[in-house]
């Protein structure tokens, strides 16, 4: 399931993050790529002082985890620290798959990948996030402050930037619900019950769907 998350960050929050980023520097991003992806990774990665990084991490992670659609789609168990990535002229990231396991304080299984856009789409050309879905490609270029989450099993790339500069924040999530198909079922049930509540109130149908949602979550969740 691919889910767009609108306005994770407000324009003021985006401007604040960009201002913090300006106090650090960008270096080659190849060091964080898996061995099979180094050859196609051509972007830059932000580095800054610990205090700056903590402010960025706190601001972005807090906004993402409080977003109502993220909560219902991800069932996040743990999350990698955000990486701030920049692609300038000619920069991008060829077709690759994200590493299945990543290490922070512990080993994290990557179930969900997340890209949070920090640059308005009109400020750069190219730079689309392109996903290969069983041979069909879908391209995404969202507004600054918007995010997209998708299964980490997805083959994807970032097209080369042909003008301007593209900045994004990236993270990977281990979910309490490892299977994407099960997360989608839970998400659909959650949306359906919220729609019933909004238009009809707490009906018998709402209670039955809520019961089913809770019991499936109980059956599938890994704690």
Curated annotation (Swiss-Prot):
Fe cation binds at residues 96, 98, 156. It comes from the Bacteria. Its EC number is 1.14.11.-. Keywords: Dioxygenase, Iron, Metal-binding, Oxidoreductase, Vitamin C. 2-oxoglutarate binds at residue 166. One of its GO terms (molecular function) is 2-oxoglutarate-dependent dioxygenase activity. It holds the Pfam family PKHD_C. Binds 1 Fe(2+) ion per subunit. Coiled coil: none annotated. Residues 77-175 form the Fe2OG dioxygenase domain. GO terms for biological process: DNA damage response; intracellular iron ion homeostasis. Its cofactor is Fe(2+); L-ascorbate. NCBIfam families: PRK05467.1-3, PRK05467.1-4. This is PKHD-type hydroxylase CPS_3426. It comes from Colwellia psychrerythraea (strain 34H / ATCC BAA-681). The lineage of its organism: Bacteria, Pseudomonadati, Pseudomonadota, Gammaproteobacteria, Alteromonadales.
